[in-house]
């Protein structure tokens, strides 16, 4: 039987965001208004807590290697996508700092004019000082998704959990709830449940790393007002995935 997390359990979290969250109604590019609203939600959730927050953001609003990179060298297409994540990190940093929250971007691909190089201990120090750390540039190597980067960075910085943010999907279902009105939502699962049932949570490399290291995952709808704040307080939101307790 799984043990559900208790309130105030989370001290340090890794929030995984889709780059498409920044696109707004256009579905592509960066909408300053949408990005500002996302920043507001994140900052509002942190207010009044001592939770340390790191963020990994994808680049799908700017580039998708499988679609945009057809005919290209696969590694080159992936590197273009990684550069896109730094662009998104800069947009999110700008929105968060405009709202008064100190942030730092750390990139696995060196570009010192816009981001600090990723150094694990420096990232942890920023978090201890109350800064939000946004990781860009993937993990610096092609052929890995930002899901895998999220898991890797979470383990490196000692995060308690990976929060997989979704839009209009409030957890993990046994089938696509947008296509099947009778789809069942899970409150909690084990990592092995996700593997055996082939549930779409994150890519296999990222999920295996979470399972091997016992890193919990919470899948939730970040655009449902108050969800992130409730999560950071330890309340039940979305679907919890963890090792068998």
From Swiss-Prot:
Catalytic activity: UMP + ATP = UDP + ADP
Annotated keywords: Allosteric enzyme, ATP-binding, Cytoplasm, Kinase, Nucleotide-binding, Pyrimidine biosynthesis, Transferase
Residues bound to UMP: 59, 78, 139-146
Enzyme class: transferase
GO biological process: 'de novo' CTP biosynthetic process; UDP biosynthetic process
GO molecular function, a single term: UMP kinase activity
Region (Involved in allosteric activation by GTP): 24-29
General function of this protein: Catalyzes the reversible phosphorylation of UMP to UDP.
Description of how the protein assembles with itself and partners: Homohexamer.
Protein name: Uridylate kinase
Species in which this protein is naturally found: Deinococcus radiodurans (strain ATCC 13939 / DSM 20539 / JCM 16871 / CCUG 27074 / LMG 4051 / NBRC 15346 / NCIMB 9279 / VKM B-1422 / R1)
């Amino acid at each position: 039987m799984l043990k559900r997390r208790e309130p105030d359990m989370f001290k340090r979290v890794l929030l995984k965001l889709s780059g498409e969250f920044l696109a707004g109604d256009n579905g592509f590019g960066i909408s300053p208004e949408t990005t500002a609203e996302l920043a507001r939600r994140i900052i509002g959730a942190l207010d009044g807590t001592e939770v340390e927050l790191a963020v990994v953001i994808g680049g799908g609003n700017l580039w998708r290697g499988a679609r945009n990179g057809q005919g290209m060298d696969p590694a080159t297409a992936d590197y273009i996508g990684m550069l896109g994540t730094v662009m998104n990190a800069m947009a999110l940093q700008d929105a968060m700092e405009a709202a008064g929250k100190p942030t730092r971007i750390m990139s696995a691909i060196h570009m010192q004019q816009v981001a600090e190089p990723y150094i694990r201990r420096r990232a942890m120090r920023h978090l201890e000082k109350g800064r939000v750390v946004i990781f860009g540039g993937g993990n610096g190597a092609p052929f890995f998704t930002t899901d895998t980067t999220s898991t890797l960075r979470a383990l490196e910085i000692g995060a308690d959990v990976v929060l997989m943010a979704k839009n209009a999907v409030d957890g993990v279902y046994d089938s696509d709830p947008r296509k099947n009105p009778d789809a069942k939502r899970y409150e909690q699962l084990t990592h092995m449940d996700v593997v055996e049932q082939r549930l779409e949570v994150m890519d296999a490399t990222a999920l295996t790393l979470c399972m091997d290291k016992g890193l919990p995952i919470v899948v939730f709808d970040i655009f449902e007002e108050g969800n992130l704040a409730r999560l950071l307080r330890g309340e039940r939101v979305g679907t919890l995935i963890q090792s068998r307790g």
